[in-house]
């Protein structure tokens, strides 16, 4: 079973990202589950959401403590929350940050999701950008399934722009992979 933990701030779309990822995995023929972790959070407060993906039914109903992957929508959370907590030894982090990040022993992939979101959406809402990057880094879901679910989640022009943002992030990761 693959377990993913999302870190974001209230209003950034971490919960929606976890749900879209689960639906894209289902679209690809996997079993999946997504759920949020809420306390008394308000807009701007740190939030977590989780996705599990497997080839067999997912029966666990508790938060993810030892993720295979961590997706961080807001770089500032690295200084506020231990986003690396419980990450498996071979775990991978996808971080919204322009430039490199020194994660010590942790494998961190960075992408300027905020820049892509501003360019495509005109707003710094990065959840779909980060999903495109995640798909590119991990290959756990196909970009086609991801884009299909994004368009179903956000109909019309908003969906088209979010799909474009996800594809841009995916292609940026692919370029980095080719140039490695």
Curated annotation (Swiss-Prot):
Q: What is its EC number?
A: 1.2.7.1
Keyword vocabulary terms for this entry: Oxidoreductase
Q: Does the keyword Oxidoreductase apply?
A: yes
Pfam families xrefs: POR
Class in the EC hierarchy, top level: oxidoreductase
Q: Does the keyword GTP-binding apply?
A: no
Q: How does it assemble?
A: Heterotetramer of one alpha, one beta, one delta and one gamma chain.
NCBIfam families per UniProt: PorC_KorC (TIGR02175), PorC_Meth_Thtga (NF040683), PRK08534.1 (NF006321)
Q: What is this protein called?
A: Pyruvate synthase subunit PorC
Q: Per the UniProt entry, what species is this protein from, by scientific name?
A: Methanothermobacter thermautotrophicus (strain ATCC 29096 / DSM 1053 / JCM 10044 / NBRC 100330 / Delta H)
The root-end lineage is: Archaea, Methanobacteriati, Methanobacteriota, Methanomada group, Methanobacteria
Its gene name is porC
């Amino acid at each position: 079973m693959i377990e993913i933990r999302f870190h974001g701030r209230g209003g950034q779309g971490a919960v929606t990202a976890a749900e879209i990822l689960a639906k894209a995995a289902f679209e690809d023929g996997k079993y999946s589950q997504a759920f949020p972790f809420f306390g008394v959070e308000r807009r701007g407060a740190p939030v977590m959401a989780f996705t599990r993906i497997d080839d067999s039914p997912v029966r666990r109903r508790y938060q993810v403590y030892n993720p295979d992957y961590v997706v961080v929508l807001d770089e500032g959370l690295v200084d506020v929350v231990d986003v690396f907590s419980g990450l498996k030894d071979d775990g991978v982090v996808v971080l919204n940050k322009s430039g490199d990040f020194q994660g010590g022993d942790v494998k961190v992939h960075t992408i300027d999701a905020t820049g892509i979101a501003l360019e495509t959406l005109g707003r710094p809402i990065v959840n779909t950008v980060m999903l495109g990057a995640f798909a590119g880094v991990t290959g756990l879901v196909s970009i086609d399934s991801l884009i299909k679910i994004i368009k179903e989640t956000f109909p019309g022009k908003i969906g088209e722009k979010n799909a474009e943002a996800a594809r841009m992030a995916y292609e940026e990761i692919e370029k980095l992979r080719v140039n490695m």
